Amino acid sequence: LQIIKIIFRYYCQSEAETILNRFYIKEETAMQNIDLICVGKLNAKYFAEGVAEYQKRLAAFASFRIIELPEEKIEEKNASDAVVKKALDKEGKAILSNVRKGAAIVAMCIEGRQISSDELAQFLADRANSGAGDVAFVIGSSHGLSDEVKKAAALKFSMGRITMPHQLARLVLTEQIYRACTINAGMKYHK
């Protein structure tokens, strides 16, 4: 870390402290854990390849893992709200049982706040610098997320008012997490 500090100070003297304060954690602190907990599997090869590429790139910045949970089967074509709620509650319990202790939950949901890549970067940096750096991003099933998961969330995040397949949402979110990490590191990828 000392070598990195020297290099940053040499090449970016005026910005070095900002970058170091924003991204780098205390020297003794471990790498930030970022989890992506998803209900359902990636079926399309091209989505899986895209996610795998960003997952590989993220290894330079954080301990990043993806946890896939099974989607509850709903038999009825026009299922009642009670049937959907029961399925969401079961998925919600599985999601919450996979969140690391002390991790901030980021619930991906339509009613969430729309934030920029810079704001996401700042959220991750703030978590890392607070000493409680673990973050768990959560993408629910096609029916959404349980109320319990949404209530537990430190941030409810929306990718906008558009509707997209959850497999695509996973790829976009993984890219945005990578982009946020590059912003925090002062890299040029995000420009």
Question: What residues fall within each predicted segment?
Answer:
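Short, Lys/Arg-enriched N-terminal segments with co-localized hydrophobic residues
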Residues: Y10-A30
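N-terminal beta1-alpha1 ligand-phosphate binding loop
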Residues: M31-L58
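A structural signal for isolated positions on well-ordered beta-strands in alpha/beta enzyme cores
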Residues: D35-I37, R65-I67, A136
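Short glycine-rich anion-binding loops that position phosphate/pyrophosphate groups of nucleotides
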Residues: L42, I110-R113, S141-G144
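A short beta-strand-loop structural module common to alpha/beta enzyme folds
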Residues: A60-I74
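Short, well-ordered alpha-helix to beta-strand connector turns
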Residues: A62, G102-A103, A153
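S-adenosyl-L-methionine/SAH cofactor-binding core of RNA-modifying enzymes
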Residues: P70-V135
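Structured adenosyl-cofactor binding patch, chiefly the S-adenosyl-L-methionine
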Residues: H143, D147-K191
